[in-house]
Amino acid sequence: SACVYEKLENGKLQGVATEGLFPPQRKMRTALSEETASRARFLEKILSSEILEEGEGIVGEVAKTGKPVFVPNAQNDPRVVKHPDPALAIRSMVYSPLIHDDVVLGVLVVANPSSGLTFSDMDLSLVNSLAEQAALAIKNSDAMNLRVEKTRMDSDLSLAREVQGL
């Protein structure tokens, strides 16, 4: 499972994209139960409403320092939140900053390899490479959105000039 945390304008971090049953980075107030209509949707809702401070937990630490963190044995790491639900048990995690032009845009977090084992140094390298690509994609998306907005404003101004000229 994985989650992308985006760094907001106020410097805080918010989960914006999840894959699988990604465990929240804080203790949950609401119990996750079998009755929950969609566990993945429920967790996605929790993660998107969970705002982390820069420096808070491992996600916040990575956002603050811009350095990746590798947790090969999460069950023995006191920094990792422990959830009572076995579906949210964390075995191993990789936290990688999304950096572009020396600016941290967010954090990519990957939990629990599908092998059931722990992540390796090679996995850490792969996640760091994915984070670099994701940061570039985010910046390209931002640039495209700015271009679209500029085109829209230019069109509105052109229309306003035509209306004024009538």
Report residues per predicted region:
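Amphipathic alpha-helical regulatory segments at dimerization interfaces
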Residues: 1, 7, 61, 65, ...
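GAF sensory/regulatory domain recognition
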Residues: 3-50, 76
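Signal-transducing coupling segments at domain and membrane junctions
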Residues: 14, 43-45, 50, 55-60, ...
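Short hydrophobic/aromatic beta-strand element in the GNAT-like acyltransferase core
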Residues: 59, 95, 107
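Signal-transmission/dimerization alpha-helices at domain junctions
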Residues: 61-68, 101, 126-147
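Regulatory loop-to-helix N-cap segments in sensory/regulatory domains
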Residues: 81-82, 100, 105, 111-130
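A short, aliphatic-rich beta-strand micro-motif
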Residues: 91-99
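Regulatory cytosolic signal-relay segments
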Residues: 135-166
